[in-house]
């Protein structure tokens, strides 16, 4: 076999009889030198909680070395110096790489809403004879070479039921078809110019289609009309993907990133060591916070970590005071600890809990019964939640920038008109949740029955209890008939027309309040899609509705 190969190379003019490379061979090899590399580092790394609140995933350290620096050094070792790093989340922390390694940073500001296919779309002109990889890999040995003769994608010999590809008899990667376990996909690839250009054309089409907002770049590589790509197989464990806190701990228990503030808080509150904190799972990303589930000494808990900019939005001392008032009353979730300085909160996990379905009349009826029961406790705290003060405050956080809405000044003036009307209305002045939205009503099966617990009391304060009805409606994005149905669920005895009009006014005011809140969060890179638009529409539409009802009432009185 070897002799046959040698003779073939000599026959083609690549080897001399003295077994030395010919000039023709050197010219051919020069054509197959990798030109550049792309490292995808824009995403949140959501499963890396709690580390990702402080450090982007590419800068996680193993044995004192950031993951992305190890990849860059391995690329430099094979003489690949032209490196593009696509950044987004905490992009500023990657800037030092420009000075240290001469990399080029490419910014993808869509990282919060779209997957890494859209990051790759930012560097399509650079693709061709290119290494492509995510930033969160740790390679024991250098997976790169000075010469590459064909396109390949790196997989391990481990079988993975979630993988969409498997290695064929020709050592090509083909769809697993769902019938067989595929090979574990690692994410590193080498793309020759023909394969790269073919894939780039597909990506240009895919990014125009919202159906592909959440897909990985591999969907473009392995498309049905794509060129075949060879498999490059490494043993299981040769490349370690670090997607979770526990994976990092397994690889390097002394990593500095394991010493996060959130983990230190858990250790302090529960009097445990870090090794006793296991089963860490990210929960859904909230509108204000990020939370994760964990196990410790047989119990399950949730750690709440405040999100971007919340220190300007929420008074954590006031939140702690609310929880002290609620303690032992069976109204909220069971609080283990709340830190009034940084907002870290630990609660016991409610097994089997589900949130209210705002489209289910039985759920809504049960939630309104719970809400009214809470209001009728007539609890009190020392602070209030002023709707109009908060509207002005959220606007002040824009730091002089105009609203994104052209008619904001008119809309704001209309909403402020409602202030005098609301001031004159009778109120049920009590501790009010303020954020009594469907997602904050938890249904819990307990002792053969169902309990409802209200969670997330960050905004709670003294206010008219009927504000909570308005908040439920606008978060659920109810139309007018649904709003009226909810009001009727709360007022089982019947709702006086003047109270109904007052609630409509609260819908207008609260709509502008949360619209301003969304505008501030948008300036931090956090977007809420249709929700923000609907809040602004509530401000406009329900102002008009209130004005019509008041005019009709005045006409009847005359």
Give the positions of each predicted feature.
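Conserved alpha/beta core of the MobA/IspD/sugar-nucleotide pyrophosphorylase nucleotidyltransferase superfamily
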Residues: 3, 17-37, 184-268
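Conserved core of the sugar-phosphate nucleotidyltransferase
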Residues: 15, 140-216, 220
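N-terminal glycine-rich phosphate-binding loop and ensuing alpha1 helix
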Residues: 28-91
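Conserved beta-loop-beta/alpha segment of the NTase-like Rossmann-fold superfamily
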Residues: 94-164
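ATP/Mg2+ or Mg2+-diphosphate-binding catalytic cores
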Residues: 252, 258-260, 517-558
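An alpha-helical support segment within catalytic cores of ATP-dependent transferases
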Residues: 262-276, 379-434, 444-446
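ATP-binding pocket architecture of kinase catalytic cores
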Residues: 281-387, 402-410
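Active-site activation/catalytic loop segments of kinase-like enzymes and analogous catalytic loops
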Residues: 466-495, 508-526
């Amino acid at each position: 076999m070897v002799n046959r190969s040698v003779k073939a190379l000599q026959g083609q003019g690549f080897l001399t009889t003295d077994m030395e490379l010919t000039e023709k061979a050197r010219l051919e090899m020069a054509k197959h030198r990798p030109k550049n590399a792309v490292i995808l580092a824009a995403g949140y790394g959501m499963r890396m909680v709690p580390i990702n609140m402080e450090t982007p995933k590419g800068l996680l350290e193993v044995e004192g070395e950031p993951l992305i620096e190890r990849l860059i050094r391995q690329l430099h070792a094979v003489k690949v110096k032209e490196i593009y790093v696509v950044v987004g989340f905490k992009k500023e922390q990657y800037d030092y790489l420009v000075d240290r390694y001469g990399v080029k940073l490419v910014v993808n500001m869509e990282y919060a809403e779209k997957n890494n296919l859209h990051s790759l779309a930012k560097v399509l002109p650079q693709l061709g004879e290119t290494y492509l990889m995510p930033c969160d890999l740790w390679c024991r040995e250098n997976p790169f070479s000075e010469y590459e003769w064909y396109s390949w994608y790196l997989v391990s010999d481990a079988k993975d039921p979630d993988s969409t590809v498997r290695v064929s008899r020709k050592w090509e990667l083909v769809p697993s078809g769902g019938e067989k376990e595929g090979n574990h996909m690692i994410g590193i690839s080498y793309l020759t110019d023909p394969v790269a250009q073919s894939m780039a054309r597909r990506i240009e089409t895919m990014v125009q289609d919202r159906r592909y907002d959440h897909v990985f770049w591999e969907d473009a590589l392995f498309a049905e009309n794509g060129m075949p790509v060879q498999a490059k197989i490494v043993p299981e464990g040769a490349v370690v993907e670090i997607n979770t806190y526990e994976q990092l701990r397994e690889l390097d228990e002394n990593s500095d990133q394991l010493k996060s503030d959130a983990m230190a808080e858990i250790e302090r509150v529960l009097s445990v060591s870090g090794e006793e904190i296991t089963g860490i799972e990210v929960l859904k990303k909230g509108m204000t916070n990020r939370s994760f589930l964990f196990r410790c000494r047989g119990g399950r808990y949730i750690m709440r970590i405040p999100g971007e900019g919340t220190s300007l939005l929420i008074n954590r001392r006031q939140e702690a005071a609310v929880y002290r008032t609620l303690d032992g009353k069976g109204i909220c979730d069971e609080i283990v600890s709340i830190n009034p300085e940084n907002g870290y909160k630990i609660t016991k996990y409610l097994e089997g809990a589900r949130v209210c379905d705002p489209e289910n009349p039985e759920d809504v009826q049960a939630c309104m019964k719970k809400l009214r029961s809470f209001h009728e406790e007539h609890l009190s705290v020392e602070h209030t939640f002023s709707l109009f003060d908060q509207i002005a405050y959220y606007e002040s956080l824009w730091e002089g920038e105009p609203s994104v809405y052209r008619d904001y000044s008119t809309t704001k003036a209309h909403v402020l008109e409602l202030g005098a009307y609301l001031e004159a209305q009778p109120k049920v002045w009590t501790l009010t949740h303020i954020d009594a939205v469907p997602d904050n009503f938890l249904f819990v099966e307990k002792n053969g029955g169902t309990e409802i617990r209200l969670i997330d009391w960050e905004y709670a304060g003294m206010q008219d209890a009927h504000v909570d009805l308005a908040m439920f409606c606008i978060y659920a994005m109810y139309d007018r008939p649904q709003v009226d149905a909810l009001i009727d669920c709360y007022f089982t005895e019947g709702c006086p027309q003047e109270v109904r009009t007052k609630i409509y006014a609260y819908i207008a005011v609260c709509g502008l309040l949360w619209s301003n809140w969304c505008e501030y969060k948008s300036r931090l890179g956090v977007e809420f899609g249709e929700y923000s638009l609907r809040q602004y529409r509530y401000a406009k539409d329900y102002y008009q509705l209130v004005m019509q009802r008041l005019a009709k009432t005045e006409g009847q009185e005359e």
